[in-house]
From Swiss-Prot:
Protein name: Heme/hemopexin utilization protein C
Family designation: Belongs to the TonB-dependent receptor family.
Motif (TonB C-terminal box): 692-709
Annotated localization: Cell outer membrane
Domain TBDR plug stretches: 36-147
Keyword Transferase appears in the UniProt entry: no
Gene3D superfamilies: TonB-dependent receptor, beta-barrel domain, TonB-dependent receptor, plug domain
Chief location bin: membrane
Gene name tied to this protein: hxuC
Domain TBDR beta-barrel: 158-709
Length: 709
């Protein structure tokens, strides 16, 4: 892979028209998410640096929210937000940074620790993708790339500095970052640092969300050596540190202690309470309502998350159609530390991942191949503090290892003068997980195929079939001890984890069809019109959920004294996606719609954590060509009444209106300056996203200034 300063700089030059900042790029091509450097590769969705600067999002999930059927899960704390893709999230969506997996996952806490200032672009693959990335890719893949010096240098400069200051009113967020970079014909180097500081978040109608303040700081260093035309090496190291004081369950609105739970229980059972006769909920409704509105017991804690990654890349790209080779060696380490504010009880979870990826592509006259081998080793260690008061009932600490080896093959077979393109792929994974006392091992084959039919020069049809799997995580395999518990006058009520030796991997079989219409010079010379429609059906077997088990010797909700990770057979996720865009030299109009429904095929019951349907419309207009652009987006989120029977909460509809403006001249006296302004939730709506335990951000004015020299 020969890197040209000119070509790489051009692809990331700040596009001042900003016409595509909020629109979905339907024909993005990149090798990061698809692992495919061939000319036939296709990345369905992409967010460029220009789009990220315009949005000024504070999390990866928020940056992707305008994509149909991609939503934010995890509440309003940015550190806990994760992308929900077609109803699946958390460890069912693979996260990739600079071509290597990020495997840290801890229930109700964050796993996306890369700050937006260090992201050059984001790619999204929607739908099962295990044939590319192995275990976990049931919902899709989110792949991020950090910048290098060649991204930031302009006009064949050899040295540069970029300074950015951002501010947001909803939480007084201050974002500072500085990058210094240089390059010549052989070497390129980049050093970046950032510091973010935020107060408590303001939600709709002026209310504050307690314990949402945070600090995050860190940096990135990259070095590249273009040895010759055929050989290049890169070395990068990234470190970030995140600090906050929040409930141990980062998705919960407030701290919820055992004492508070007991108080609510006593109030409910008190015969002298003032419930109107028809207003008092049933016993089951009461307990399910507590869980759905407040979450579980969660104590206020000081939290720190050091995260680091080191990656070595080697590229071999001789003038040989059989060789286009990439080798990556990497080491990731993430530590999640918590200390309870009142009792001082300490917890720690540490995950280290070491791995190697080897990939090669071969271009033959009538067929193209991409093939490779991945190996990674995860090592997790946990510490769980206890005492006789608030930490009496705790999960047991565990240490475990996991080894995964995967081999994959992707082929592209053009037929009938490339009118048809057949792209089959397959991946075989072997994995084992072990603790001191237990060992599991298994393997899985993940096939996929894609057929693209170019009917005319303005109409394409695509049909996909993808299979995916997710092996049980080490937490699902090895967690033991108490899930939660409390002491009462009649004794201890303890909910304990029960191991499940028969826990099976989740598997997914996805069917998908897409129609893509694209016209040039439709109404006037130089305009472009695109419309894309997709229907998918993802059948997920053995979906793993934590299930509370009844005690056969007792009655009522209080008898739920065990929790066990179990497989739910025959879950079905289906939905549609529509997106359209019309673009002229100055004007861009766009709309998109996404809807996902999920149910258990056996019981017919709705699945949890399925985002509400949404439709968005917007426009961008260059008031001053190549200099100043304004835009607006209106998004309607439908009511979500499809919830599990024991969820006890439904969610009303709401509409959000966002405005934006960008000043970024390509030439002239101020060509090195870029200003972005955004006003989100213009009318300060009070709203709560489906399945979130807290309300969303209120009116938020954002401003960002970037200066390069």
């Amino acid at each position: 892979m020969r890197f040209s300063k000119l070509s790489l700089a051009i692809t990331t030059t700040l596009v001042t028209a900003n016409a595509l900042a909020q629109s979905v790029e339907l024909d993005s091509i990149n090798v990061i998410a698809t692992r495919d450097p061939s000319r036939f590769t296709y990345t369905p969705q992409k967010q460029s640096k220009d789009s990220l600067l315009s949005k000024q999002a504070t999390s990866v999930a928020a940056a992707l929210e305008d994509i149909p059927n991609v939503d934010v899960r995890g509440g309003s704390r940015s550190i806990a937000q994760k992308p929900n893709i077609r109803g699946l999230s958390d460890n069912r969506v693979v996260q990739v940074i600079d071509g290597v997996r990020q495997n840290f996952d801890l229930a109700h806490r964050g796993s996306y620790f890369l700050p937006m200032s260090l992201i050059q672009e984001i790619e999204v693959i929607k739908g099962p993708s295990s044939s590319l990335w192995g275990s976990g890719a049931l919902g899709g893949v989110v792949a991020m790339r950090t910048p290098n010096a060649l991204d930031l240098l302009k006009n064949n400069d050899k040295f540069g500095v970029k300074i950015r200051q951002g501010y947001q009113t909803a939480n007084n967020l201050s974002e500072k970052d500085v990058s210094v970079f240089a390059a010549n014909d052989k070497f390129d180097v980049l050093i970046s640092g950032f510091y973010n500081n935020a107060d408590n978040l303001r939600i709709g109608k002026g209310n504050k969300l307690n314990n949402t303040a945070y600090k995050q700081f860190g940096g990135l260093a990259k070095f590249g050596w273009q040895i010759n035309d055929a050989n290049r090496v890169e070395l990068s190291h990234r470190e970030t540190r995140f600090k906050q004081t929040a409930p141990g369950n980062n998705e919960a609105k407030n701290e919820l202690t055992n004492e508070q739970i007991i108080e609510k229980i006593n109030e409910y059972h008190n015969p002298l309470n003032n419930f109107p006769p028809k207003a008092k909920p049933s016993l089951e409704e009461f307990y399910s309502g507590v869980r759905a509105r407040l979450g579980g017991v969660s104590y206020l804690s000081d939290q720190q998350i050091p995260d680091q990654s080191t990656v070595f890349n080697y590229y071999l790209t001789p003038d040989n159609p059989y060789l286009n080779t990439h080798i990556a060696l990497y080491n990731n380490k993430t530590i999640e530390k918590e200390q309870r504010k009142v009792s001082g009880v300490k917890d720690q979870t540490k995950l280290t991942t070491r791995g190697i990826n080897l990939r090669n592509s071969s271009e033959l006259s009538h067929i193209s191949f991409v093939y490779g081998v991945d190996y990674m080793r995860d090592k997790i260690s946990t510490e769980r503090g206890t005492n006789d008061k608030d930490a009496k009932f705790r999960a047991e600490p565990y240490n475990a290892n996991s080894n995964t080896t995967g081999v994959y093959l992707i082929a592209h077979i053009p037929l009938f003068g490339e009118k048809l393109l057949l792209s089959p792929s397959v991946r075989y994974d072997h994995y084992d997980t072990s603790s001191k006392t237990v060992k599991y091992k298994d393997n899985h084959l993940s096939p996929a195929t894609k057929l693209t039919w170019k009917v005319t020069n303005w109409l394409d049809f695509t049909a996909k079939y993808n299979e995916a799997f997710r092996a049980p995580s080490m937490q699902e395999r090895f967690v033991s001890g108490a899930h939660f518990g409390t002491s009462t006058r009649v004794g201890d009520i303890i909910n304990s984890f029960v191991a499940n030796p028969n826990l099976r991997p989740e598997t997914a079989k996805n069917k998908e069809i897409t129609a893509n219409l694209h016209f040039d010079s439709l109404f006037k010379q130089g305009d472009k019109f695109k419309i894309e429609a997709t229907y998918f059906r993802n059948d997920v077997k053995d979906l793993i959920n934590l299930k509370r088990l009844d005690d056969p010797n007792a009655n009522g909700a209080l008898s739920r004294t065990n929790s066990q990770y179990q497989n739910i057979a025959n879950a079905r996720l289906s939905g549609i996606e529509l997106q359209a865009q019309y673009q002229t030299e100055r004007l861009t109009l766009f709309t998109n719609y996404g809807s996902t429904k999920g149910r258990d095929k056996d019981s017919g019951e709705a699945l949890s954590n399925i985002a509400a349907s949404k439709i968005g419309v917007g426009a961008d207009y260059a008031l001053v060509k190549d200099k100043f652009t304004v835009g607006a987006t209106i998004t309607h989120y439908a009511a979500q009444h499809r919830v599990p029977k024991d969820h006890a909460v439904t969610y009303p509809s709401y509409i959000l209106t966002d405005l934006r403006a960008t000043y970024a001249p390509l030439k002239g006296e101020w060509k090195n300056l870029r200003l972005d302004f955004a006003l989100e939730n213009l009318f300060d709506r009070k709203y709560q996203p489906a399945f979130s335990l807290m309300e969303g951000t209120g009116r938020n004015a954002k401003i960002s200034a970037v200066y390069s020299f």
